[in-house]
Curated annotation (Swiss-Prot):
Disulfide bonds: none annotated. GO terms for cellular component: cytoplasm. This is Imidazoleglycerol-phosphate dehydratase. Residues 184-203 are annotated as: Disordered. InterPro entries: IGPD_sf, ImidazoleglycerolP_deHydtase, ImidazoleglycerP_deHydtase_CS, Ribosomal_Su5_D2-typ_SF. Keywords: Amino-acid biosynthesis, Cytoplasm, Histidine biosynthesis, Lyase. GO terms for molecular function: imidazoleglycerol-phosphate dehydratase activity. PROSITE patterns: IGP_DEHYDRATASE_1, IGP_DEHYDRATASE_2. Belongs to the imidazoleglycerol-phosphate dehydratase family. It is an enzyme of class 4 (lyase).
């Protein structure tokens, strides 16, 4: 029986209550209800372009601001991703993608190494897109990286529209992550490291 690559996390704090479920071998089905409309839209991009089935439910103190919910959703997504990857046997491990959206062009490179690191180089011109604080984009990816055990490099090669820059980033991340988490048929029973082990973050 083939092992399913799914991760499910329930995270409760005094500030938020977050549930995340991820199936790495899905078809792009998504149900996102975080209370933050723009974040829901970006999670839908992650699901659609990564072909991950993602369910996210969150209740948080958004009457104060979106910071806690945004970060805790990122934490839970990272933890669910790490759980779905397990010991990371057979994955391609590395992924990269260049995604355009009109004038914006974003490059993302990811390594499912178990070693969290974020290099984030976006020049986002506006402080808000709708009601969403754009500084929270970096906070979201930082939370995913730290709890998912990813090395992630994000580079903006072009772009001057805030929405386009952020959406292209999520699309590029989705495609790169899809590539990195796919099973490599040439090493389906091996861990993709000369050390013979990759760390499991977020456990």
């Amino acid at each position: 029986m083939e092992k399913t690559r799914e991760g499910e996390i329930r995270r409760e704090t005094k500030e938020t209550d977050v549930f995340v479920k991820i199936d790495l071998d899905g078809s792009g089905k998504c149900s996102a209800n975080t209370g933050i409309g723009f974040l829901d839209h970006m999670i839908q991009q992650l699901s659609s372009h990564g072909l991950f089935d993602i369910e996210v439910r969150a209740n948080g103190d958004t009457h104060i601001d979106d910071h806690h919910t945004n970060e805790d959703v990122g934490i839970a997504i990272g933890q669910a991703l790490s759980k779905a990857l397990g010991d990371r046997v057979g994955i391609k491990r590395f992924g990269h993608f260049l995604a355009p959206l009109d004038e914006a062009l974003i490059q993302v490179v990811v390594d499912c190494s178990g070693r969290p690191h974020l290099s984030f180089s976006l020049d986002i011109p506006s402080q808000k897109v709708g009601t969403y604080d754009t500084e929270l984009v970096k906070e979201f990816f930082g939370a995913v990286v730290s709890n998912g055990g990813l090395t992630l490099h994000i580079r903006q090669l072009a772009g001057n529209n805030t929405h386009h820059i952020i959406e292209a980033t999520f699309k590029s991340f989705a495609r790169a992550l899809r590539m990195a988490t796919e099973i490599d048929p040439r090493r389906s029973s091996q861990i993709p490291s000369s050390k013979g082990v990759l760390e499991q973050a977020g456990q």
